[in-house]
From Swiss-Prot:
GO terms for molecular function: 2 iron, 2 sulfur cluster binding; iron ion binding; monooxygenase activity. Disulfide bonds: none annotated. Disruption phenotype: Mutants are not able to grow on the tertiary alcohols TBA and TAA. It comes from Aquincola tertiaricarbonis. This is Tert-butanol monooxygenase / tert-amyl alcohol desaturase oxygenase subunit. It is an enzyme of class 1 (oxidoreductase). Its EC number is 1.14.13.229, 1.14.19.48. Keywords: 2Fe-2S, Iron, Iron-sulfur, Metal-binding, Monooxygenase, NADP, Oxidoreductase.
Length: 470
């Protein structure tokens, strides 16, 4: 049987309002100051003040790699000495692409007339020119400082006199034995709608929990589902951090009558994010990040998530993660993270990629109808707008990164399990879970002032105190 004919009154309120709402779909994009990232744009210049991943180390072979980052066409390569170069793609001589250049012992040589550039863009040789040519003193190839770390290639694309130190956080090296495995995921949409997805934690209890067509293959459905407590609707709060240069959310869930799980994920402006355990509610008393990533614009309608999966016995004691499945445009958790699935499968088992990219190349914020669950997304946009407008104080992470004396920097992304008995009413139980979450966040902030060797013992001791008080 088909649908009945609508009642005559339908469409006067909210039912069958397609015709009435049709023209409203043609709104212009808003928040352009944080969506556009080309040279000279507010967000583009802001992002250029930070080190950005541009490719994976495994992509640098014996030939150059053409890349596009922040609207700039570039070429990345590793010369035979092992030094990494990130140069403007068009040769300074006559514009031939250096993606066809020949990697040298030192630098790269253009295939057209043999101009030879070092990784810093210095012209080393122009073979067809007279020996006394002054070109080497007056011409250079556009180049950006670059380095490799744990399988990612980073470049700094901003003003030379404002280049910051690269911040090294606790989770990059701790606990002992941590392995950072690089990955990338390509998204055919603006960077911000992907970045916002990370702070929109409510979707983990919905999109990632049996949001599948009835009768779909059980193995496929399980692969798209977050296990171990993620299906419980979280009690969430969002808080600015780092003098409004970042934010976190706390998500509290009850796991049993006697146990509560507190999860914290953190964003660092402009485009860095760190998440705690991914495969399940971490069974440890306290564990750190399981993933760090940057959402890097290619242009305004394409972006790439570059990052590391953190592998260690603390965040993945059951060894469910699969290092071999991380790499170029692939990652080892949750079906639906990449663009490589058959269309019918994406309809039956939609994932992050489908939910994010289907918003359009640039999501139209003017069409949104936000609710209370969207507070974090709108806080993120507000912080970004203030940052590009110069309203935020200096980023303390940038300041501390240059004066750590070899100490890694603390961050807050973590999972903690607390023995807290269930309260008689749902409201009272929600209140105690929220209180515990706020106290866990306060504990993590206390570590800002502690040397690295004291941070974990301090957290564990203070978690005991929270349990005793609640």
């Amino acid at each position: 049987m088909g649908n009945r004919e609508p009642l005559a009154a339908a469409g006067q309120g909210t039912a069958y309002s397609g015709y009435r709402l049709r023209d409203l779909q043609n709104v212009a994009p808003t928040n352009l100051e944080i969506l556009r990232t080309g040279p000279g744009t507010p967000m583009g210049e802001y992002m250029r003040r930070y080190w950005q991943p541009v490719c994976l180390s495994q992509e640098l072979t014996d030939v150059p790699k053409a890349i596009r980052i922040l609207h700039e066409d570039l070429v990345a390569f590793r010369d035979r000495r092992g030094n990494v170069g990130v140069l403007h793609r068009k040769c300074a001589h006559r514009g031939a692409s250096l993606e066809f250049g020949i990697v040298q012992e030192r630098g790269i040589r253009c295939c057209y007339h043999g101009w030879h550039f070092d990784v810093d863009g210095s012209l080393l040789e122009a073979p067809a020119e007279p020996p006394d040519t002054k070109l080497k003193e007056t011409v250079c190839q556009g180049a950006y400082p670059a380095f490799e770390r744990n399988g990612l290639v980073f470049a700094y694309m901003g003003p030379a006199d404002r280049r910051p130190e690269f911040p090294v956080f606790d989770g990059y090296v701790l606990p002992k034995g941590t392995r950072l495995i690089p990955f990338s995921n390509v998204f055919d949409c603006n960077w911000l709608q992907v970045y916002e997805n990370q702070i929109d934690h409510y979707h983990t209890a919905l999109l990632h929990n049996n949001m599948t067509v009835a009768g779909v293959d059980a193995k496929l459905a399980d692969g798209a589902t977050l296990q171990g407590g993620f299906g419980e609707m979280p009690i969430i709060d969002w808080h600015p951090t780092d003098d409004n240069n970042g934010m976190i959310f706390t998500a509290g869930r009850r796991l049993s009558d006697d146990e509560v799980w507190i999860r914290i994920s953190q964003m660092g402006l402009p485009n860095w994010m760190q998440n705690a355990a991914i495969v399940a509610a971490a069974p440890q008393r306290h564990s750190g990040p399981a993933m760090s990533r940057w959402q890097v614009p290619v242009d305004d309608e394409h972006s790439i998530a570059f990052g590391w999966r953190h592998f260690n016995d603390e965040v993945d004691p059951e060894h469910r993660g699969r290092e071999e499945e991380c790499g170029v445009d692939k990652i080892d958790f949750l079906i639906g993270q990449t663009r490589h699935r058959p269309y019918e499968e994406t309809q039956r088992v939609p994932g992050d990629y489908e939910a994010i990219v289907s918003q359009g190349p640039i999501a139209l914020h003017g069409l949104e109808h936000p609710g209370r669950s969207d507070v974090g997304v709108y806080m993120c946009r507000s912080l970004l707008r203030d940052a590009v407008a110069g309203k935020a104080p200096p980023d303390p992470v940038r300041v501390k990164a240059g004066s750590t004396d070899g100490q890694t920097l603390p961050r807050y992304a973590s999972d903690s399990r607390l023995r807290i008995r269930r309260r008689p009413s749902r409201e009272a139980d929600s209140d105690v879970i929220r209180k515990a979450a706020h106290q866990v966040f306060a504990i993590m902030k206390e570590c800002d002032e502690l040397p690295v060797v004291q941070r974990r013992p301090h957290v564990l001791r203070r978690l005991d105190e929270i349990e005793a008080s609640l």
